[in-house]
Amino acid sequence: MDRLSEASLKFLTSSVNLEGTGKKFKTPALFKFCEAFVPTLMRSFTNIHFKGLENIPMNGAVIFSGNHLSNLDPFIKILASQRPIHFLAKEGHFQKQPNRFIMKNTGQIETFRKSGGKDALARAFDVLDQGLCLGIFPEGTRSRKNSPPYLQNGKTGIARIAARFPKVPVVPICINGS
């Protein structure tokens, strides 16, 4: 694949009209605490197998993108990556306790779907700009189709984020049977 010129990269990144909030994004302490026991818990009641883990960068900003079958998927992706991932998540996950506490205190990004998720995309910018990992489900919701095509149409957020950060690797993750 040919590389884009610097002028082309500059045009691409400016044309998506995506900027951050300017606020520092940190991985909260609760996320770090959960990293200590969630992998053991997940392995105790699931039969998870991973392939291709050698393709996951261990340093720098990364966009993790993939299908979404169940509420376990973010945990599975974090377990596979062995890195903190900050996911774009629908506002419904932030409305009631204890979910709200967990989502806020593990660094997940609240996405208001009806407004197009502009605030969430700005926070996604902040995550990547600071060299952290972003998780996104391009369909914007869980896949519930039982026959081909299994996936729903994707949203534009992943394309806009990837265009704004063309040097950040996008790691596709496929989950079966969650």
Please place each PLM-identified region on the residue numbering.
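A transmembrane-helix-recognition feature enriched in membrane-embedded lipid enzymes
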Residues: 2-51, 76, 97-106
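Soluble catalytic domains of membrane acyltransferases
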Residues: 27, 44-178
